[in-house]
Amino acid sequence: MMILSLTAGLAACGLAGEGSQAAAKDAGVQRYAWPLGSSSPEDTVTQIYAEKFADEVERLSDGKMKISVYPNSVLGGDRELLESCKDGDIPFVVQNTAPQVTFMKDTAVFDMPALFDSIDEVREHVDNPKFMKLMQQVYNDGGYELLGYADQGFRVMTTNKKIESLADFKGQKIRTMENSYHMAYWKALGASPTPMTFSEVYIGLQQGTIDAQENPYEVIVSNKLYEQQDYVVETNHLPHLISLIVSEEFMKGLTDEQQQILSLIHISEPTRLLSIS
């Protein structure tokens, strides 16, 4: 799934400096690129999504507006990125929706286990204008603007223990994100959910701090988690939604021209072929 309508704009941010804001408005050209932060690796749908957005912004502005993409948690983990984005220090963030539940509880619509039967059903909701309008209001209330969604298919479990029945989940220490809905799901199965920053997962599996983890296939492969795990259990318990958001504080500094340029952006399907269904 990758049908986006991006109707927000750009303005100078804290990392670019107030001086560059004035220069950009006066000369119509940015002195520094605006940062877009992500915690995902380069070889993922998340990165391609972010780069496509940055490319379209530059193309439609004839090179006057530039965005630099920073993957691999270079600018911070998911929580740090959200906090910095809300403050306007990092204007753009592309990330999974799960960490956002702490900041905007209604984003949990994608964190209810076993709610969707197929990834196509998820995409139907995301592509529904009425649904998107409701979600955009949720982000507005939280201090952000929602520009669009993408997905990486469903999340699955990897483990070193063969799972043949529900009883086999009992006692397994599984890494989860810091999300109460995710943790409640694994507790209900008898597992022991262990919230952990993703950058620590590989070492955690290697050292035995955790027994298992759950992520979409692309994340498992790109981070070589298969080197530490023997089995994949296709639980398909949650869709892995990727959101592109912008700071509301950052948006206040937009010029009319910048808003007009971004209103023209429509990313039709830059990563559909890489999205696993």
List each language-model region with its residue ranges.
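N-terminal secretory/targeting leader peptides
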Residues: G14-E121, K130, Q137-S268, R272
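Serine residues within intrinsically disordered or low-complexity segments
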Residues: S275-S277
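Short beta-strand-centered segments that line the small-molecule binding cleft or hinge
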Residues: E124
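Sec-dependent N-terminal signal peptides of Gram-positive bacterial secreted proteins and lipoproteins
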Residues: M1-A16
